[in-house]
Structures are given as C-alpha cells and as structure tokens.
Curated annotation (Swiss-Prot):
Residues 32-37, 93-116, 160-163, 223-233, 292-298 are extracellular. One of its GO terms (biological process) is cartilage development. Residues 1-10, 59-71, 138, 185-201, 255-270, 320-336 are cytoplasmic. The keyword Endoplasmic reticulum applies. Pfam families: SBF_like. Keywords: Cell membrane, Endoplasmic reticulum, Golgi apparatus, Ion transport, Membrane, Sodium, Sodium transport, Symport, Transmembrane, Transmembrane helix, Transport. Disruption phenotype: Morphants have reduced head and eyes, a curled body, tooth cartilage that is bent downwards, reduced Meckel cartilage, absence of the fourth ceratobranchial cartilage, shortened or absent palate cartilage, widened palatal skeleton, reduced cleithrum, notochord, and lack of bone mineralization. The keyword Transport applies. One of its GO terms (molecular function) is symporter activity. This is Sodium/bile acid cotransporter 7.
C-alpha cells in the first residue's frame, strides 16, 4: 500500500495526532472565549450537526426499532449509572490506602457518577458499523436521565448536593439532540431517493466533527493551570483511568457477546461505547453547580478532564480491531 493510500485509510488517526499537537501548541484558540468559541461551535453547533447527520442517515424504521430494544437500554443505563459508580466506590476504598491525592480520588468518583456523552459514543459506534440507532437513543436518554440521577449519586457517594437548573439543561439537550434528529429525519423523507443514490459520506462528516471536539477538549486540558500536578500524580491518574476503561469495556464485551445475552455484534459495540463513556459537556457544568464554593473543585475536575479525551483516544485506537471483529462475526453468521 502506497503512502497516499495509507494516509487516506488512516486519515482519522493522523487527524487526532495533528489536532492534539495543535491544541498543545495553541490551547488558547479552542478554549471558551477563544477564536473558535467552543461554547457555541462545539456545545451547540457540533453536537447539533452530529445528530442532524444521524437523523439524515438513519432509516426511520431502524430508529423506531431501536426504541423498542428495552433489554439493551436497561443494560446500558444500569451499567453506567448503577454498576459503574458502585464499582469505582469499592475501588476507591482500596486506593484510599495509597498516597494518591484524596481530591483526585473524589474526582474519580464524580466521573463514575456522570451520564454518557451525547456525541462520542454515537460517532464511534457509527464508525465501526455498530447499532447507531441504539447508541443515539441511549446517549440522549442517558443524558436526560443523568441530569436527575447524577446529582443524587454525587449526594450519595460524596455528600454534596445543590439545586440544579434542570430546565435550562433539559432545554439545551432538547435543542441540540432531539430537534436536529427530528429535522434530519424529516429531511430524509423528502431526500430519501437522492441520499440512497448519491450515498453522502455521513461517516466522514461525523469524524471531522469529532476531531473538532477532540481539539476543543485538549485545548481545555492543556490550558487548565490546575492540570499542572506533579508528574507522578498525573501518570497515576491516567493509568487508573485507562485501566478502568479497558477493564469495563472488556467486561461489557464478555457479557454482551455471550450467546445467552441475545445481543447482536452491532448491539455489543453500541453497548460497549455507551456504557463506558462519560460526558464532559454535562459533567463540568454539573460539577461547578454541585461543588460550588469547594476549594478543591479544580482537583476534583482533573479526572473528568482526563477521562473524556482518554475515552475518545482509546475508542479511536480500538476502531480497527473492533471493525475486524465485526467483519469476522458477520461472515460467521452469514449462511453459505
């Protein structure tokens, strides 16, 4: 395979390296209030584009079918909002015996209490040919559910509570997730024949938007002065976060691919991404609300700032392997 062909095939991985490098060199460009204005372009425009794109590309019957997949939805929401925080709480009982900063450990617990994101899990699921409709439903439903459940979980595990502006957060989710999805579906009704004939690069569009989200996320990470902890603490937290993600992804893969689970290969991919990913977009504002006035808020936020880009990086690196597994699974199930 020639160099140009290799670049075309691996353009997304190359793009990740480039945007992270640029974020490191010029983090001020992609932070809130910077030239990119991510508080608008990422929070509203990028997320809206992702779900409009999904609405335009998804067959209505597939989305309707996903809504009825109750077993899958129950599995995802139970794992991410019940099993995840309890498992991390038990892990932190052990880690509390070490020299790791107490507030960083509390930050890990806040990560566990967060809802799934409304973008990355959908894009990664779509990129490998997983059950995109199920990923969309669980990302949106989990985000709405998390607005109520996450503050309660933080109260239970960390003893912190505050009045949460449910109305404004629900409104934002409705406008950036539900409305674009519906508009995309309506447009598809009128453009179905054209879309089926031309086959627009929906996956490439979503991948470009994801690169924007990665860039903005790393700009925030590199621009945050509170990230400058000692190297050992940072490396320890990064190692713990990647270990948690890999362990939980492996656990979900094992549970969802058993014959008795009743899930297809496409379902397993959607479950794996939706149940292990956590929302930075909802998480950071929620932490600022729930922990308002906390002297150590910045330290509590560090694990979430690391977890979000880590989940996107890990998912992106695993894409080729998951694609290969999906192809092999489909060939096995295809009758000769």
């Amino acid at each position: 395979m020639g160099l140009i062909a290799r670049v075309r095939k691996e353009w997304f991985i190359i793009g990740i390296v480039l945007v992270i490098t640029f974020a490191k060199l010029q983090p001020s460009v992609g932070v809130k209030g910077g030239p990119l204005h991510p508080e608008i372009t990422i929070t509203y425009v990028a997320v809206s584009v992702i779900f409009f794109n999904s609405g335009l590309s998804l067959k209505t019957e597939e989305l309707a079918s996903a809504l009825m997949h109750v077993k899958l939805h129950f599995f995802v929401q139970t794992f991410t909002l019940v099993f995840f925080p309890i498992a991390i709480w038990l892990l932190l009982k052990v880690l509390a015996l070490t020299a790791i900063n107490e507030w960083l450990l509390r930050g890990l617990q806040t990560v566990a209490c967060m809802p799934p994101p409304v973008s990355s899990a959908v894009i990664l699921t779509k990129a490998v040919g997983g059950n995109e409709a199920a990923a969309i439903f669980n990302s949106a439903f989990g985000s709405f559910l998390g607005i109520v459940v996450t503050p309660l979980l933080l109260l239970v595990f960390l003893g912190s509570s505050s009045s949460v502006p449910f109305t404004s957060i629900f409104s934002q989710l409705f406008m950036t997730v539900v409305v674009p999805l519906i508009v995309g579906q309506v447009c598809r009704r009128f453009l179905r024949e054209c879309l089926d004939r031309r086959k627009p690069p929906f996956g490439a569009v979503s991948s470009v938007v994801l690169l924007m989200i990665i860039y903005s996320t790393f700009c925030d990470t590199f621009n945050n002065p509170n990230i400058e902890l000692d190297h050992l603490s940072l490396l320890t937290v990064v190692f713990i976060i990647f270990s948690i993600q890999l362990s939980f992804m492996a656990l979900i893969f094992f549970l969802s691919t058993r014959k008795s689970s009743g899930f297809s290969a496409a379902d397993s991919v959607a479950i794996m991404f939706c149940a292990t990913h956590k929302s930075l977009t909802l998480g950071i504002p929620m932490l600022k609300i729930v922990f308002e006035g906390y002297e150590h808020l910045s330290l509590i936020s560090v694990p979430l700032l690391i977890y979000h880009p880590a989940q996107i990086l890990l998912g992106s690196v695993l894409l080729p392997s998951i694609k290969t597994w999906m192809s092999g699974r489909q060939k096995t199930l295809t009758p000769i």
